[in-house]
Amino acid sequence: MALKKVLTIAGSDTSAGAGMQADLKTFQELDVYGMVALTSIVTMDKETWSHDVTPIDMNVFEKQLETAISIGPDAIKTGMLGTQDIIKRAGDVFVESGADYFVVDPVMVCKGEDEVLNPGNTEAMIQYLLPKATVVTPNLFEAGQLSGLGKLTSIEDMKKAAQVIYDKGTPHVIIKGGKALDQDKSYDLYYDGQQFYQLTTDMFQQSYNHGAGCTFAAATTAYLANGKSPKEAIIAAKAFVASAIKNGWKMNDFVGPVDHGAYNRIEQINVEVTEV
């Protein structure tokens, strides 16, 4: 049986823990065929690990999209898009491609960096991506930006933000709480327009979690492509990334990536799902 084809529109992380490298590793683990349209290349200073983002020429980006669309993706995921032009184009490509699912990971900062890559990108995401997305996967910071509510510090804050984001056109909103809400448990909040669900796992080590957000969104995309409902895909992706985080490892003195193969190779983590 032919594999489902999944396109990631994302940046390249030279350390390979996040970005399109994380997406492709996740796609391989979850039995979908991964394709890439590269938006940028992220490199790191060897002394400080500060990030430098080099955009891909727009003509080259367009040629990548032409190739991918000609193949016919079943699902599309976005990661680091970088510019408002690319954000708009990503939304257009979903429509042009005829793909069944569109997962938006609204990347706004590089791991370890504090400043938004391009403040104007938030409004572009709201205008061009949220109305077309099947699922959007913001972390707390990104959800605060997309909703306009600012800093989110509780499940109730997350519910308010999820409702605002849902009202902007995305039918399935999953806000990743991570370690910000509790030191013992990891809480995410899922909203489908009818019911809020809290997704809970134990809190695992947080020193080596580079690429967790990309991996979660990529897993959601893969599960959707392979036939799971959005709710099922999100819960399964939470389990997949929890295993990856628990088995994260030290790469150097600055960073450690998640283990993208841990779910299949080592262990599968249980996710508790409760209505809230």
Curated annotation (Swiss-Prot):
One cellular-component annotation, GO: cytosol
Species of provenance: Staphylococcus epidermidis (strain ATCC 12228 / FDA PCI 1200)
Protein name per its UniProtKB record: Putative pyridoxine kinase
Reactions performed catalytically: pyridoxal + ATP = pyridoxal 5'-phosphate + ADP + H(+)
Entry binding sites for ATP: 139, 176-180, 188, 213, 238
CDD domains documented for this protein: HMPP_kinase
Keyword Mitochondrion carried by entry: no
tRNA processing found in the keyword field: no
Record GO terms (molecular function): ATP binding; hydroxymethylpyrimidine kinase activity; metal ion binding; phosphomethylpyrimidine kinase activity; pyridoxal kinase activity
Enzyme class per UniProt: transferase
Residue positions binding Mg(2+): 142
Source superkingdom: Bacteria
InterPro entries (alphabetical): HMP/HMP-P_kinase_dom (IPR004399), PM/HMP-P_kinase-1 (IPR013749), Ribokinase-like (IPR029056)
NCBIfam families (UniProt xref): HMP-P_kinase
EC number: 2.7.1.35
Keyword tags: ATP-binding, Kinase, Magnesium, Metal-binding, Nucleotide-binding, Transferase
Gene Ontology BP annotations: thiamine biosynthetic process
PANTHER family: PHOSPHOMETHYLPYRIMIDINE KINASE, PYRIDOXINE KINASE
Family: Belongs to the ThiD family.
Function as written in the Swiss-Prot or TrEMBL entry: Phosphorylates B6 vitamers; functions in a salvage pathway. Uses pyridoxal, pyridoxine, and pyridoxamine as substrates.
